[in-house]
Amino acid sequence: MKILLKGGRVIDPAQNLDGQMDLLLENGKIAAIAEAVGSVPEDTRLLDLKGMILLPGLVDMHTHLREPGYEYKETIRSGSEAAAVGGFTSIACMPNTLPVNDNRTVTEYILKRAKECDTVHVYPVAAVSRNSEGKILAEFGDLKEAGAIAFSDDGKPVMNSILMRRALEYASSLDRIIISHCEDLNLSAGGLMNEGKISTELGLPGIPTLAEDVMVARDLLLAEFSGAALHIAHVSSAGAVRMIRDAKKRGVRVTAETTPHYFTLTDEAVTNFNTNTKVSPPLRSREDLQAVREGLRDGTLDAIVTDHAPHALTDKEVEFEYAANGISGLETALALSLTLVDDGLLTLSELVRKMSVNPAKILNIPKGTLRPGADADITVLNPGKTWVVDPSNWRSQGKNTPFFGWTLKGKVIMTLVQGRIVYQED
């Protein structure tokens, strides 16, 4: 199959490209990229994309696909289809499944199911510890051999400091990273939302930013001591941003991510007890939100991820205390992130770097570019299209979103994976 994508604005930060160009796709690869591709074979399919923006396929390095074990929340198929709708061509799925992805059998199952679904690239993240209990290290070497791209107990922190040190050193020896969920469970115990004025007014137990900051500080010190690569997940606090910034200046091998809800929402969103605003870490204060936005602007935060955490209605339509944590984010992440461009915080090229180039680089996967010879993984964006968030139309089984009814600007109209159109807007 040969496809000529003609007349669109191509943005590829990996090549410092931003301009109107043609892309020729052949045998699943980028065959040519030029201001005007010359003669093409007769059997080439022509797609006129004038007015559209073509990006290297987005890479989400923090997704929860729920399968195996929680298929009532999401499946690898529904999650992959949601990713394609959102413009993501590669996703890294977290290990908090049932059973936990702490052994090669589960890793191989995920890869097998992803291959059967044949939608987007799926990269399994395996657990740091057996059953993510934080007691005994998982078999990193065996998991890497099976296809694990990184290690994380995400959803839970590794509270044991010596275990975390060993995990960093073990992963480093295998050229893999640890993705750390930074939370001191002793400080967050019993909390339901961010500790502050709003939690006091609502009468809900609070989780202080200190619960995040203490573990960020510990993990940065462990990474500095060991020389290993550390990636800090879903950064939400001003203290965490500040410490990561300082650590980078000292040469610590640390990268960090945040999600759209931490730069678009504050704890004020919880005031009507909407359980779709319950997330871990919790939505923080206005000051924390501003610090996260500044961290994105100055490069302290390397990546924007979805932390896509789909849940069934029964997990959310309960009292706030009993509701599950998480937001379903694959189908809204890009449009929410485009608000950073509209606000002048990032250029479009800088945003693409944080949603494609950098995540691919951090995970060490061959994605995030439209260079000739690369896989033809492409996100086609209509930058001017406005749309209303309505989860009843989503491909994801998880309809849990605090953004219901929001009008957003910028819509993915087509997603290609290895030259195949895996999503096209009706």
Curated annotation (Swiss-Prot):
GO BP field: 'de novo' UMP biosynthetic process; purine nucleobase catabolic process
Chain positions recorded as Zn(2+) 2 binding sites: 154, 181, 234
Enzyme class: hydrolase
Keywords annotated in UniProt: Hydrolase, Metal-binding, Pyrimidine biosynthesis, Zinc
GO molecular function: allantoinase activity; dihydroorotase activity; zinc ion binding
Superkingdom per UniProt: Bacteria
Protein's name in the database: Dihydroorotase
Signal sequence coordinates: none
NCBIfam families registered for this protein in UniProt: pyrC_multi
Annotated catalysed reactions: (S)-dihydroorotate + H2O = N-carbamoyl-L-aspartate + H(+)
GO cellular component: cytoplasm
InterPro entries to which the protein is assigned, alphabetical: Amidohydro-rel, DHOase, DHOase/Allantoinase_Hydrolase, Dihydroorotase_CS, Metal-dep_hydrolase_composite, Metal_Hydrolase
Residues the entry annotates as binding Zn(2+) 1: 62, 64, 154, 307
Cofactor: Zn(2+)
Record-annotated active site: 307
Family per similarity comment: Belongs to the metallo-dependent hydrolases superfamily. DHOase family. Class I DHOase subfamily.
SUPFAM superfamilies: Composite domain of metallo-dependent hydrolases, Metallo-dependent hydrolases
Gene name per UniProt: pyrC
Protein role: Catalyzes the reversible cyclization of carbamoyl aspartate to dihydroorotate.
Pathway stated in the Swiss-Prot or TrEMBL entry: Pyrimidine metabolism; UMP biosynthesis via de novo pathway; (S)-dihydroorotate from bicarbonate: step 3/3
Binding site for substrate: 64-66, 96, 311
HAMAP family on file: PyrC_classI_B (MF_00220_B)
Cofactor annotation comment: Binds 2 Zn(2+) ions per subunit.
Protein EC: 3.5.2.3
Coiled coil (UniProt feature): none
